[in-house]
Amino acid sequence: ELVKRGAGVITSITTRIRKGRKNQATLYFKSWDDINFQIQNALLFFPDEGTDNKLLNNFDIRRKNDRNYLKKAYQTLIKDFPDKKAQIRPEILLIKYALLGFDKCKDLVNADENIIRFKSREFDKHKAYTSDPNIAFYLKDVCIDVFGKSLDPNLEIADCQGADSTDPA
């Protein structure tokens, strides 16, 4: 399996598969601004309970205080919704993945889009990023170049799926 993920709720990533001279996976990470914007939008759906709006307008997951606020918001949200509903609400999942993936991805995300490549023997390492929803949240796009005679060089297959699939088969 080239992609190793299913249709996602939050972590849907556009993956392009095309013919290449060798197997190579290129992962495009979101910028910090993109990540913080997504989290701010998710937080807009919840009551502020007297929260300082300055924090919400200037949220940055890199700051420990902001992550602590996000953890509190997440804990409140999972208490407010029955178990099964908490697991399918996109805003709650987004916050969960952002928090759980932060430590793994903080050095891979930059002010601008960051790109990492896995070539040849390292090719399959991309699956660890695309199959884990906590990491996949931080991905913007994936491009997979596959060596093969049967692939037309003018053909590109696009797939939009995610690691948090309800049916990863």
What residue ranges belong to the model's regions?
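Globular "head" domains of long coiled-coil molecular machines
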Residues: E1-A169
